[in-house]
Amino acid sequence: MEDEAALDRGASFLKHVCDEEEVEGHHTIYIGVHVPKSYRRRRRHKRKAGHREKKEKERVSENYSDKSDVENADESSSSILKPLISPAAERIRFILGEEDDSPAPPQLFTELDELLAVDGQEMEWKETARWIKFEEKVEQGGERWSKPHVATLSLHSLFELRTCMEKGSIMLDREAASLPQLVEMIVDHQIETGLLKPDLKDKVTYTLLRKHRHQTKKSNLRSLADIGKTVSSASRMFTSPENGSPAMTHRNLTSSSLNDISDKPEKDQLKNKFMKKLPRDAEASNVLVGEVDFLDSPFIAFVRLQQAVMLGALTEVPVPTRFLFILLGPKGKAKSYHEIGRAIATLMSDEVFHDIAYKAKDRQDLIAGIDEFLDEVIVLPPGEWDPAIRIEPPKSLPSSDKRKNMYSGGENVQMNGDTPHDGGHGGGGHADCEELQRTGRFCGGLIKDIKRKAPFFASDFYDALNIQALSAILFIYLATVTNAITFGGLLGDATDNMQGVLESFLGTAVSGAVFCLFAGQPLTILSSTGPVLVFERLLFNFSKDHNFDYLEFRLWIGLWSAFLCLILVATDASFLVQYFTRFTEEGFSSLISFIFIYDAFKKMIKLADYYPINSNFKVGYNTQFSCVCVPPNPVNISVSNDTTLAPEDLQTVSSADMYHNATFDWALLTKKECLKYEGKLVGNNCDFVPDITLMSFILFLGTYTSSMALKKFKTSRYFPTTARKLISDFAIILSILIFCVIDALVGVDTPKLIVPSEFKPTSPNRGWFVPPFGGNPWWVYLAAAIPALLVTILIFMDQQITAVIVNRKEHKLKKGAGYHLDLFWVAILMVVCSFMALPWYVAATVISIAHIDSLKMETETSAPGEQPKFLGVREQRVTGTLVFILTGLSVFMAPILKFIPMPVLYGVFLYMGVASLNGVQFMDRLKLLLMPLKHQPDFIYLRHVPLRRVHLFTFLQVLCLALLWILKSTVAAIIFPVMILALVAVRKGMDYLFSQHDLSFLDDVIPEKDKKKKEDEKKKKKKKGSLDSDSDDSDCPYSEKVPSIKIPMDIMEQQPFLSDSKPSDRERSPTFLERHTSC
């Protein structure tokens, strides 16, 4: 009774008998991706059940229902519409819900081989398709593989596959060392169970051991050798006179025409480049289907080996086989066998059925897996979709975790729809972050940070042993050097060279190297910021107006600020970071990105002003454009027509000699020399410099465009995967080198990078150490605490917001953060920089994001058609440390760095600003303002929040950003950090303007004091809640509640093409599925 299929409960509903044409058309119903199965249809008509129908219902009720009797026939017939979990789902929940310590099942490579005639003579197993994630077919020409595509299956083939599993041999956890041993085991099992006649054993064995021909690239000589082997084996093959099939003897088993039964892989397998697409622990699933003329009923077997075994040349790639599905059937149904083979191969590539196949205990577990797959598919009407069209793989695959969690006793998720919302959507609330939990003890957070990071300290060095780290070092180094030069120049102008470019280089090197070596998050890059520059300018002017010693006053402000930062560290004040929601993070990071973009264009416009373009120049009138140098007072100068001084002799001529004694030709002077000796430039072309501005803009935009294009080269169709990845990793360095070479070849004198060549203070009025006393009155030391409070807010906000952005959940950092440890080292370094009169440094948002982007890791092996999965970031201390060491050594590399044009580095700045805006939800919402409704992307928040509320949220964020920009551009920029803090208050005020439902999708819900208590209560309710019904209310108040239709496939009987070896004892009419699936 266990193997006997139940009767079809809906058989009597259909009175129409299908003809052969309709059955053939049934194959054109194709199945694609999953859709919601939660639709309830009401029955409008009631019909009195007949005698036969009542009898069938009573039988089903006895076998599958917990009720003792069935009183209402109509209620019984419509029970599939009740939102009760099906027996198949119950069984899968039991299978996947088992908690064990075994590792996750390995990746499967599935190969479909079909029994085909070679050159119209002998039969061989020929590979026709393969799967890892998506299907690849051998094109009809037989010379190439198709592009990976989503497998579209006929509904009919899935029903037939289910029947195969019901009627065929299921052999689980068997042991075999070779293919002949495995085949013999399968055939003997079929004979023992009465599914195969003993006299057919030799023929079936001979067929299953035929040679396997794989679709691999071979040389012409190898192809000729294969042809010779085929002819040789054909000469040894003979045909049985009874049925025309090859006869089988024990002598034939050792014939060279059979499959290579060696347990070692062949050379072609070892050379197959397709192995790069498979992980190292991958296993194989082989599907063998074909038609023979000596069988009257199908030969079906599904085998799972206890341990994966190498079965010679059975598989295209040298991976051990774990699963084997065999289907041999009578002649005339090759199309059906092919579709059934595709169906089981597609199921084996499905993540849920893949797990079920590894954990199944018996036949019913496998059938339940097929039923679960059927529950999750959609059917496309045959008249509205051409099944010949191959569906391209999606860029992002839907996670199978939803389906797995449903059956593994996890959270209550709604299948084929939206998952219950948990709030953050990747940016995350930080309330549940372990690093931000307040300990209540003195330096408790700092101690926990040290304990958390100490075990990873050694790995932080050897994890950098990858070529990707080299590209990150070069990229971030150039960005850091450019920023140090720019900031140092501005700081020198603001402080009368008390701090200049060299101090900027030295401070960057010392602070950055120490921070990356010992801080909690070494991926953070320290740099100077705009608010610090504004503060330095105001402080210098204040000291100058009140006759204070600027460097000593600044020293005491730095000491007080460092002291206040250490107090914040000791009191675990970093827990306040949890109030920095997506609204604050994206507002801050977007502002800094816009500043980078604005500054890049601002520098180029300034360069265009310095080297103006002569827009009135006409080629035909170039003789009218000139510029000559003339002496300031021709009367006092003796100009000789006979004797002149060459330009190289000018250094020996004093200014007095030029005015009184020298005979001199002023026309030979350069523009710089002419102005130096007080000459005059005369002509209509003196204010213009040819080609420099245009060439600079070409370098600027070319570097940016090239960097963007090469960074995306990883997803290009050109070159092998390794070459594309290498080009993508070194995209910025390659762009810089390309346009440096172009600049050198063209020869236009574009402005170049200028690095100090001497190691000494910029100003001769200062040294490398600032004495703490003697320059100012004693009360200044105490009064310095007031401006130090403002600096502390500035440092805390810049540092912690950048740290929050770096430690976002979507970066998948595994070694943890260290908010307290980071702030501790920033305070210590502030003391060092104050004593050495070096600039103060804090985390730089854009450069830190660029550092993370340059170290992102993706899966090395990905299935054809599958996008590489983001694994995380290469967390280590080497790249940052070497970047800052190289920055300090840049003084000695000035002869090399002077060949880099400044417009190229400005292009890198533009790239960093634009790249850091990628993936920011704020930018996505800005784009929505310009999109018609029908073209808007399917963002999760657009499903649940009205569009006008989304636009209102975006408008408020833009308004705050505009106010911050205006504030930054004025003298009031010194209170910029305080206004960043005000963003938290603005976000808190949004609670009165938006509902918590809307904010949970647009932003993160601000943590409340009792949030942990609520979460604990929610978990208790989940444990007490029943797992037996899909219609229970979700714990999430925002999930949609819709009824689910569960069709228990266990109660359907299907006999599409199989003949039962044990005829039924009673006569009955054909069932619904029999009439639809019989061939």
Swiss-Prot record:
The modification Phosphoserine is found at residues 61, 65, 68, 223, 232-233, 245, 256-257, 262, 1026, 1029, 1034, 1044, 1069. Residues 39-78, 238-265, 1012-1079 are annotated as: Disordered. It catalyses: 2 hydrogencarbonate(out) + Na(+)(out) = 2 hydrogencarbonate(in) + Na(+)(in); 3 hydrogencarbonate(out) + Na(+)(out) = 3 hydrogencarbonate(in) + Na(+)(in). GO terms for biological process: bicarbonate transport; regulation of intracellular pH; sodium ion transport; transmembrane transport. Residues 961-986 dip into the membrane without crossing it. It is found in: Basolateral cell membrane; Cell membrane. Residues 1-466, 521, 572-585, 711-725, 808-819, 856-877, 919-960, 987-1079 are cytoplasmic. The chain crosses the membrane at residues 467-491, 502-520, 522-542, 551-571, 586-609, 693-710, 726-745, 780-807, 820-836, 838-855, 878-894, 902-918. Residues 1002-1004, 1030-1033 are annotated as: CA2-binding. GO terms for molecular function: monoatomic anion transmembrane transporter activity; sodium:bicarbonate symporter activity; solute:inorganic anion antiporter activity. It comes from the Eukaryota. InterPro entries: Band3_cytoplasmic_dom, HCO3_transpt-like_TM_dom, HCO3_transpt_euk, Na/HCO3_transpt, PTrfase/Anion_transptr. GO terms for cellular component: basolateral plasma membrane; plasma membrane. It is a multi-pass membrane protein. Its main location: membrane. Residues 1057-1059 are annotated as: Required for basolateral targeting. Gene3D superfamilies: Helical hairpin bin (1.10.287.570), Mannitol-specific EII, Chain A (3.40.930.10). Signal peptide: none annotated. Residues 251-260 have a biased composition (Polar residues). Residues 1-62 are annotated as: Required for interaction with AHCYL1. Belongs to the anion exchanger (TC 2.A.31) family. Electrogenic sodium/bicarbonate cotransporter with a Na(+):HCO3(-) stoichiometry varying from 1:2 to 1:3. May regulate bicarbonate influx/efflux at the basolateral membrane of cells and regulate intracellular pH. Homodimer. Interacts with CA2/carbonic anhydrase 2 and CA4/carbonic anhydrase 4 which may regulate transporter activity. Isoform 1 but not isoform 2 interacts with AHCYL1 (via PEST domain when phosphorylated); the interaction increases SLC4A4 isoform 1 activity. Interacts with AHCYL2. This is Electrogenic sodium bicarbonate cotransporter 1. It comes from Sus scrofa. The gene is SLC4A4.
